[in-house]
């Protein structure tokens, strides 16, 4: 299963979505402080965020060190790329919903 972060802009104006495995998203939800910004229950369809909260989430993720096995095994280079994709989306989106 996977999780897809979708920009809240109208269709045709949205930035590209970010899709990731459930485990990858659940680890993001478990970052300290994330619970003050969004619903961190491990259900894939409950989370939404405003643009301001999305930017705060990006700051938390940027300073976070993912656990081994986070995405693509223990490939630290890939971990940094995935963090970059997620943070870039969160900084540029007009808020998001999860599908």
Feature locations, PLM:
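Acidic (Asp/Glu-rich) sequence patches and key acidic residues
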Residues: 1-99
């Amino acid at each position: 299963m996977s999780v897809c972060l979708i920009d809240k802009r109208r269709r045709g104006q949205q930035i590209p979505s970010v899709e990731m495995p459930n485990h990858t998203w659940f680890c993001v939800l478990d970052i300290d402080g994330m619970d003050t910004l969004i619903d961190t229950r491990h259900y894939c369809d409950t989370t939404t965020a405003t643009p301001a909260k999305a930017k705060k989430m990006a700051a938390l993720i940027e300073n976070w060190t993912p656990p081994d096995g986070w995405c693509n095994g223990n490939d630290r280079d890939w971990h940094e790329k995935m963090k970059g994709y997620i943070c870039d989306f969160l900084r540029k989106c007009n808020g998001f919903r999860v599908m």
